[in-house]
Each structure stands twice: as structure tokens, then as C-alpha cells.
From Swiss-Prot:
Presence of the UniProt keyword DNA damage in the record: no
InterPro entries the UniProt entry points to: FHIPEP_1 (IPR042194), FHIPEP_3 (IPR042193), FHIPEP_4 (IPR042196), FHIPEP_CS (IPR025505), T3SS_FHIPEP (IPR001712), T3SS_HrcV (IPR006302)
Signal peptide: none
Name the UniProt record assigns to this protein: Low calcium response locus protein D
A GO cellular-component term linked to this record: plasma membrane
Source species: Yersinia enterocolitica serotype O:8 / biotype 1B (strain NCTC 13174 / 8081)
Length: 704
């Protein structure tokens, strides 16, 4: 072969897209054009080769994602087999000859007995259809469903790892792509298994059509006796069925191996994984050897065979057990060296540790980090809390809070704890409890007033105050339908957890904005606002930027509009070095958002005001130091002022509209700190944060 021919072949080999297109066109022509027996033999051999190669690939891949194109390959191979079946059927009916492979397969399987041949063919087809294909189809369906259900949790875990600095942005992007690819593959496999199932059904139909059509043609057109025609066409038909079903069986096994493969970080090929996991249980092999020995002692059983098998399995288990003991001793010696080398007391080496953790205790202690967001729930509630529903609720809460505040909250960890009280749950930030509550088995949580429940005749039990100024009641699940008809709001256990968690996250939102999170937000903006990011980093240090975002979020101001916030930092950052005052200027740049938020989209803002004398009193008590400014009001004046606020505002929960308190910009922050212990939910705004379109509706004025 000359160099030009080799170069031409190399070019064709590089254009795999053209090769696939040619293959698909060839499949179509195979169904239409008659093929000579020699070509059929070659194509049948190619079909068998493809199925064997695919089976070997399935055995040696480390993860199903390494062969993510398999669903498409399954479709192509199924079409190829069906086209072959059409071609061989045409040749059998027209010429009573479908090539050497078909005849040899048929003659070998039938073995001179038509009934035996058909029975063997049916057994192979039924095994493929009812056992392998049916099981693989179910596994693919469940895998697709579970893969989709697990996506939100995996995404949250990736977000948490990225914010904790465990992985960078690129690795997080790769992990998200892997999750998406995995979901798409299992979803495709769920549908692709229908090809294999349909192929098995088509094989059963084709064999009966071929026998019936062949006998009819042999008797009516070729003048053969019925018995002779049945013998000839049955051999060819069974051979055709076998050369189609054997590759189909191999590919069905391939599909089964791929969808049932459980991959992990240390996975290798399938044989190595199976061998590694089997030999890891020497006790099971020892017990198996004893059972085989007992089988050998049963009268009538082949004693010698079972004794040999019992000896092999028992000896293998004994040798593996000895090897495992030696490895455990070596690990214990290594642990002793590590602990003594670190200066730990000698008694520490005798502490009981699991085999998986030996030799790594020091590493775990050095690098173990607290969980940012943890929910501990009494283990008795595990069945009552539906995992999928709870996961959906938690994802919805994080999404809603992000859209409202712009804070990228970390993943939420749920832990069922046996040491907690009955029905108790605990919400912890950085593993420090900040809120707790109780879930009552067989009950729903209702936030409506007592009068409404009594009016409907629904018995209730008073619940604990999960949130300030909000009474809750427990109502039996028997009354769920009545609550729905009365349009009264109620919560399941999953909804109680997420509702309580949403308030906790909103209250402690500023704790989730640190330097790492600020850097992440800036990186997200670099693609569209590169120059702005460079300028703001030049003017405002990252630490000050973080503190500003914390102050905004701490007062329930969203930071999603990062462009306006950063532009305000650039505008005022060089003029104002005090972070508190700089935050006030940034708030004024967000006036449109603030007015829309607290006026509920209207032009009227119900508000309480401070008298000029009160403002002057507070202003004169502000002290400036090198460390910052603070309010130094006399305790008696503070108490008098708070008393006037209580008289003027009263109980916020009894007010229909959501009012605000408006003061001058220079004292706004100090007034907020002054009243937040009693009126945490009352927003404090400055006059500079109001747009021209807003009309203030005075509800009262605080005077001394």
C-alpha cells in the first residue's frame, strides 16, 4: 500500500462523524437492498465483534460516565441488528440461504431436533427479556430518578465546599458538569433500555414469521414436502435468531453492568472491585466453607466435589484472615509511631479507633472544620421526615433567601441524633446552637389565632414560641382536610424545619458573608464588570468591603445589586474612610430598592418619626475614636427614650401595615442599635434613602 493510501485512511479515521453517518446510511440500505451471503457473514461477524468489545469496555471502565455515549451506541447497535435480521430474513425466504454463519448456528443449536432448537432459542430470549433487560431497565429507571432527586443536595455540597475553600471555582464547575452529565446519562439509559427490550420482542416475532413464511414458500412455490420445508427453514430461522440474540444478549449484559455499577473515587475495573470487596470479608468465606462441608455430608450429594470446594473456600478465607490480622498489627504499630512522634502521651496509643481511621487521627484533628449550617433532629423523626420533600424544601429556602438577600448560603447538613429529646430539633451555626424547636408526631403546626381554631371546633395543643411574637399550635393530622377547606395555613414536619430555618438564616445572614464569600461574589462579576471590579479593589480593601456587605445584610438589605453597591464604593470610598458612614452612603444609592421593599410597591410609606430634640440628643452623644464611633447616652436618658418609643409605637404585631422609623442619616445606625433589642423587625431608614416619589404617612412622633 502506497503512502497516499495510508494518508487517505488516516484522514477517514480522524473524521469519526463521517464514519458514523456512513454506518447509519448503511443500516438503512441493508433494510432495502438484498445482500449476498458472503456480505451477510461479514456483517454478522462485525455485529458479534461489536457486542464483545462493548462487553469488555463495560468490564474495564472505572465509572459509567467514562462510557456516557453508551445510550446512543445502544440505539445504533439495535438498529444494526434489526437491519441484519431484515436482510437475513429476505435471503432465507428468497434463496433459502443466509450465509455460512446462520446455517452453522442453526444446525449446531437444533442438533437434528427442531423442538430442542426452538426451546433453546426461547430460553435464551426469555433470559434476556425477563431477567437481564427487565432488571437493567428497572435499575436505569431508579438510577435516573435518584440522580435527579440528589442533584440539589450535590449542588449544595459543592457550593459549601467552594465557600469553605476546599475546592476552587474551576473544580466546582467541573463537579457540576459531572453531576449534570451523570443525570443526563442515567436519564438516557432509562429510555435506551427500551431498545433492548423491544429488540428481544422483535426477535421472538421474527422467528415465528420466518418459519411460517419459509414453510409456506417452500411448499407452495418450491415444491418441497412440508416436513422437508420445515426442516430446512427451521434450521435457517433458528440460526438467524441465534446470530441476532447472542450479540443482543451480550449488549444487554453490557447495559446491565453499566447501570448497576457503583463507582467511587478508588474504583478500578469491575473485576478488581469485585475481587477487592469479596476478599475483604474472610469470615464470610470461612462460614461458606463450613456450609459447603455440611452440603457434602448430605446423603446422595457428590461428597468429594463439595469437600474440595469447602477446602478451597475455607483455606482461602483462613489465609485472608491471617493477612488482614497482620495488616491490622502493622497499622497499629504505625499509629503508635505517629502518636508518640507528635508528643502525645503513651496512653493515647491504646485508644480504640476504627480501622479506617488508624494512622490518620492527627490529620483529622488538625484539619477538621466546623459545619457552617447544621440541623440536628431526634432520630425517631427519621421516618416522619420525607427525605425528598425535605430536600426540596431546603433547596427552596436557600433559593428564596438568595433571591431576597443575595447571600450565597452554604449547604445545609441534616443529622439524626439519638441523644436528643423526643421530637426535638436543633439549628446550629458553626456547630453552636442558635435555635431549637419540637416536632410532635402525628400533628401539624398551625400559626392561626386561637379564635379561628375554636370557631371550627378543632382541638389544639399550644406549641412553644419558635419565633418572637408568633404563637403556634399543634393540630392532629386527622383535621388536615378541615384545615384545607377552611384555608388555614398549616405546616408538616419538613415545612416546620424549613420555616424555622428560614427565619434563623435571615437573622444571622451577616454571619455567612466573609472575606471568602466576598471574593466569590467579585469573581462572579468579573466577566461582565471587569473594570469596575479593578477600580473598587483599588479603592476599598477586601476587608472593608466585607464589613459593608455584612452591615447591609444585617439590616435585611439585599446585596444582589452588586453593581450599584460597588459603584457607590468607588464614588464614596476615597472621600469617606469610616465604614459606618460609608455604608450609609451606599444605602442612599440603593434608595429605589429600599423604598420599593418597605412601601410594598406603593408610593405611601407608613412611618414613625423622631422629634428634632430627640435627634439632637442622640447626635450630641455620639463619640468619635480612632477605633470608630459609638453612642454614649446616659442610661437614664436611654431608658426614657426607649419608654417613649414603646408608648409611640406599641406592639408591632398588632399593626396591620408594616411601618418604618425615619431619622437623619448621621444618627440612623445608632438609633437602629438602640432599639433593635426590642424592635428588631422595625426597619430604620434615613431621609436620604427615600425617593422623590415616596410620600411619608406619619403614624407617630417620638418626643422626650
Amino acid at each position: 500500500m502506497n503512502p497516499y493510501d495510508l494518508e487517505w485512511l488516516n484522514r477517514i479515521g480522524e473524521r469519526k462523524d463521517i464514519m458514523l453517518a456512513v454506518l447509519l446510511l448503511a443500516v438503512v440500505f441493508m433494510m432495502v437492498l438484498p445482500l449476498p451471503p458472503l456480505v451477510l457473514d461479514i456483517l454478522i461477524a462485525v455485529n458479534m465483534t461489536i457486542s464483545v468489545v462493548l462487553l469488555m469496555i463495560a468490564i474495564y471502565i472505572n465509572s459509567p460516565l467514562q462510557f456516557s455515549a453508551f445510550p446512543a451506541v445502544l440505539l445504533v447497535t439495535t438498529l444494526f441488528r434489526l437491519a441484519l435480521s431484515v436482510s437475513t430474513t429476505r435471503m432465507i425466504l428468497l434463496q433459502a440461504d443466509a450465509g455460512q454463519i446462520v446455517y452453522t448456528f442453526g444446525n449446531f443449536v437444533v442438533g437434528g431436533n427442531l423442538i430442542v432448537g426452538i426451546v433453546i432459542f426461547l430460553i435464551i430470549t426469555i433470559v434476556q427479556f425477563l431477567v437481564i433487560t427487565k432488571g437493567s431497565e428497572r435499575v436505569a429507571e431508579v438510577s435516573a430518578r435518584f440522580s435527579l432527586d440528589a442533584m440539589p443536595g450535590k449542588q449544595m455540597s459543592i457550593d459549601g465546599d467552594m465557600r469553605a475553600g476546599v475546592i476552587d471555582v474551576n473544580e466546582a464547575r467541573e463537579r457540576r458538569a459531572t453531576i449534570e452529565k451523570e443525570s443526563q446519562m442515567f436519564g438516557s439509559m432509562d429510555g435506551a433500555m427500551k431498545f433492548v427490550k423491544g429488540d428481544a420482542i422483535a426477535g421472538l416475532i421474527i422467528i415465528f414469521v420466518n418459519i411460517l413464511g419459509g414453510v409456506t414458500i417452500g411448499v407452495t412455490q418450491k415444491g418441497l414436502a412440508a416436513a422437508e420445508a420445515l426442516q430446512l427453514y427451521s434450521i435457517l430461522t433458528v440460526g438467524d435468531g441465534m446470530v441476532s440474540q447472542v450479540p443482543a444478549l451480550l449488549i444487554a449484559i453490557t447495559a446491565g453492568i453499566i447501570v448497576t455499577r457503583v463507582s467511587s473515587e478508588d474504583s478500578s475495573d469491575l473485576g478488581s472491585d469485585i475481587g477487592k470487596q469479596v476478599v475483604a470479608q474472610p469470615k464470610a468465606m470461612l462460614i461458606g466453607g463450613v456450609l459447603l462441608l455440611l452440603f457434602g455430608l448430605i446423603p446422595g450429594f457428590p461428597t468429594v466435589t463439595f469437600l474440595i470446594l469447602a477446602l478451597l473456600v475455607g483455606c482461602g478465607g483462613y489465609m485472608l484472615s491471617r493477612k488482614q490480622s497482620r495488616n491490622d498489627e502493622a497499622n497499629q504499630d504505625l499509629q503508635s509511631l505517629l502518636t508518640s512522634g507528635s508528643g502525645a502521651p503513651a496512653a493515647r496509643t491504646k485508644a480504640k479507633t476504627s480501622g479506617a481511621n488508624k494512622g490518620r487521627l492527627g490529620e483529622q484533628e488538625a484539619f477538621a472544620m466546623t459545619v457552617p449550617l447544621l440541623i440536628d433532629v431526634d432520630s425517631s423523626q427519621q421516618e416522619a421526615l420525607e427525605a425528598i420533600a425535605l430536600n426540596d424544601e431546603l433547596v427552596r429556602v436557600r433559593r428564596a433567601l438568595y433571591l431576597d438577600l443575595g447571600v450565597p448560603f452554604p449547604g445545609i447538613h441534616l443529622r439524626f441524633n439519638e441523644g436528643m429529646g423526643e421530637g426535638e430539633y436543633l439549628i446550629s451555626l458553626q456547630e453552636v446552637p442558635v435555635a431549637r424547636g419540637e416536632l410532635k408526631a402525628g400533628y401539624l403546626l398551625v400559626r392561626e389565632s386561637v379564635s379561628q381554631l375554636e370557631l371550627l371546633g378543632i382541638p389544639y395543643e399550644k406549641g412553644e414560641h419558635l419565633l418572637p411574637d408568633q404563637e403556634t399550635f399543634w393540630v392532629s393530622v386527622e383535621y388536615e382536610e378541615r384545615l384545607e377547606k377552611s384555608q388555614l395555613e398549616f405546616f408538616s414536619h419538613s415545612q416546620v424545619l424549613t420555616w424555622h430555618l428560614s427565619h434563623v438564616l435571615r437573622e444571622y445572614a451577616e454571619d455567612f458573608i466573609g472575606i471568602q464569600e466576598t471574593r466569590y461574589l467579585l469573581e462572579q462579576m468579573e466577566g461582565g464588570y471587569g473594570e469596575l471590579i479593578k477600580e473598587v479593589q483599588r479603592i476599598v480593601p477586601l476587608q472593608r468591603m466585607t464589613e459593608i456587605l455584612q452591615r447591609l445584610v444585617g439590616e435585611d438589605i439585599s446585596i444582589r445589586n452588586m453593581r450599584s453597591i460597588l459603584e457607590a464604593m468607588v464614588e464614596w470610598g476615597q472621600k469617606e474612610k469610616d465604614v459606618v458612614q460609608l455604608t450609609e452612603y451606599i444605602r442612599s444609592s440603593l434608595k429605589r430598592y429600599i423604598c420599593y421593599k418597605y412601601a410594598n410597591g406603593n408610593n405611601i410609606l407608613p412611618a414613625y418619626l423622631f422629634d428634632q430634640e430627640v435627634e439632637e440628643k442622640i447626635r450630641s452623644a455620639v463619640r468619635q475614636t480612632s477605633a470608630g464611633s459609638y453612642l454614649a447616652l446616659d442610661p437614664a436618658v436611654t431608658e426614657s427614650l426607649l419608654e417613649q418609643v414603646r408608648k409611640t409605637i406599641g406592639d408591632l404585631s398588632q399593626i396591620q401595615s408594616k411601618p418604618v422609623l425615619i431619622v437623619s442619616m448621621d444618627i440612623r445606625r445608632y438609633v437602629r442599635k438602640l432599639i433593635e433589642s426590642e424592635y428588631y423587625g422595625l426597619p430604620v431608614l434615613s431621609y436620604q434613602e427615600l425617593t422623590q416619589q415616596i410620600n411619608i404617612q406619619p403614624l407617630g412622633r417620638v418626643c422626650l
